[in-house]
Every structure is written in C-alpha cells, then in structure tokens.
Amino acid sequence: MPNIIKIFSGNAHPQLADEIAAHLGMQVSEADVRKFSDGEIFVEIKKNVRGTDAFIVQPTCTPVNDNLMELVLMVDALRRASARRITAVVPYYGYARQDRKSAPRVPISAKVVAEMFMAVGVRRVLCMDLHAGQIQGFFNIPVDHLYAAPVLLKHIKKEFGEDVVMVSPDAGGVERTRAFAKRLNTGLAIIDKRRDRPNECEAMHVIGDVRGKVAILMDDMADTAGTICNGAKTLLENGAKEVHACCTHPVLSGPAVERITNSDLKSFVVTNTIPLGEEAKNCPKIKQLSVSALLADAIERIHNEDSVSSLFV
C-alpha cells in the first residue's frame, strides 16, 4: 500500500477525529474499539494498514485510564499490522499535572505515560498546550507541541474591543498570558493568591490595572473552575467592567459547570481538545471553539515531511 495518511480514533473524542479527517478530505479509518463484559478493552483494525502513515486521535481525558489503554492497544495493533509510522495525536495529555516528584515516594506519572507510548511503538506525538512544557523531554521521540493560541486570539479579536486587559489567574500562568497580551497589544494583570497569616483564608490581590476594562482570564485548563470563578469575583471587586475567561482544556470535573453558571463570568471560552459533557453543553456561558483545522494542518505537514514550526505560536 502506498504511503498514505490513515486517521484512527478511539472512543475518547470521535467527533474531533471526524473534523480532522474532513479537513484532510478523508474519513476516519474503521477500527473496532470496545469493552468486554469484564471491562477489558478490545481493539481490531478493520482494514489493511501496511506501509501507511497512521495517526490516532485520542485525548486521554476522563475516563483517563480507559482512554489511555485504548490508545496504547491501538498503537500495538497498528504496529503489528505493519503501519509505517504511528503518531499519537493527544490534544489533551492526561497525567500532565503529575510531572515531578511533589512529595516523597510518589511517581512521576507524566513520565510513565511517555514511557508507555514509546514502549508500544509510538514514533511521534502531537499534543496541544501541555500543562508543563518540560513533558516533551520525557520522550525520546519527536514531540510536536502545538498551542491553541491562534484559535483563541482570533475569537478575542473578533468579540472584544480595545479596552481589554489579559489576566493570569496565578503566578504560574504569567508567561502564557503575557504572550497573549503582547499579540493583542493589551495590558497585563496577575492575580496573586497568598495567606498573610497562618490559618487565615487565602487572599487574592490584583497586580495591574483592570479598572473600567474588560478582563479576560487565561489558563491552560479548567478542572473544578474554582480558581477562574474566584478570580472573576476579585477582578470585579477591583473595578473591572466585565470578566470573561478562555482556556484550552475544558476538564470541568466535579462542581465546575455549576460554579461557572453561578459565577461573575460573562462567558467562558474553551476548545474541543476534550469533548463537553451534556451539562457543559447546556451552560449558556460556555462556548467551544474547534482546533481541528490546526491539528489537521500539523498532520498534513508531518506526513509531507514539511516544517511544523510555523504552527508553534
């Protein structure tokens, strides 16, 4: 079989795989990925893949362990079926927050996942907005680390005027937020969280001028959404005209959607690296943008051995 692209998908996000395939002018290749009655995962690639350039679209989001196991079994099946190269397209990299030893006698889970990928035969990884960029160093294979910035920047430019300030919800996100502020030529503010005395509630202080401006909180992911929602309240208390939020990965676990619904946020913009649950889909404040065109462009460049560096913005 000639060296052609084949797009595959597990059960994590088939809609994203369909969108990517549509941008590439093809359909997702057929694979049977299901569970046995005892919970074991079964994978069967239904068509010949010998000599093909295979891309598996599978964010390792909730249920993270099922989706991770589906991915590694699909890779093994494709490798044994003689695919020429297998690329794991993992828009959301589960376990990314466990990227270092934060306490004695704990694993570095993000490294373990990387070792699993390489052990089963992944030859390249395509991911987006890693929680910790140094995860790229856990791999001994090429990692193309894309950013959702082009998609989010386009939305911000379209929806908001010039009276905007970009806000980092914590000190750790300053570099990301500064990059957005620079591209948009806007101001930058930071929310500093600290306890002034032991046993006191955490206080939130705004560093920067937000008074009378549209404040846009930026983060790489929203899990329980507590930081974002509390940040919105603090910004309004400091004189912001209104508050919006943007993030790449809508993890949205536990009380997240309820918090967003009841928060001071006017809107909460996310991308489709992770599929939204029904509760999130029905929340009028949450808007989802697609990164499928960006991923499709990267896949095409990788297949054609073209440079992907222009996408790293």
Curated annotation (Swiss-Prot):
Ligand binding (Mg(2+) 1): 131
Catalytic activity: D-ribose 5-phosphate + ATP = 5-phospho-alpha-D-ribose 1-diphosphate + AMP + H(+)
Residues that hold Mg(2+) 2 according to the record: 170
PROSITE patterns found in the cross-reference section: PRPP_SYNTHASE
Details of cofactor binding: Binds 2 Mg(2+) ions per subunit.
Any one of the GO BP annotations: purine nucleotide biosynthetic process
Cofactor(s) annotated in UniProt: Mg(2+)
E.C. number: 2.7.6.1
Record: residues binding ATP: 38-40, 97-98
Active site: residue positions: 193
GO cellular component: cytoplasm; ribose phosphate diphosphokinase complex
Gene3D superfamilies cross-referenced by the UniProt entry: 3.40.50.2020
PANTHER family according to UniProt: RIBOSE-PHOSPHATE DIPHOSPHOKINASE FAMILY MEMBER, RIBOSE-PHOSPHATE PYROPHOSPHOKINASE 1, CHLOROPLASTIC
HAMAP family tied to this protein: RibP_PPkinase_B
Protein family (similarity comment): Belongs to the ribose-phosphate pyrophosphokinase family. Class I subfamily.
Protein name: Ribose-phosphate pyrophosphokinase
Organism from which the protein derives: Desulfotalea psychrophila (strain LSv54 / DSM 12343)
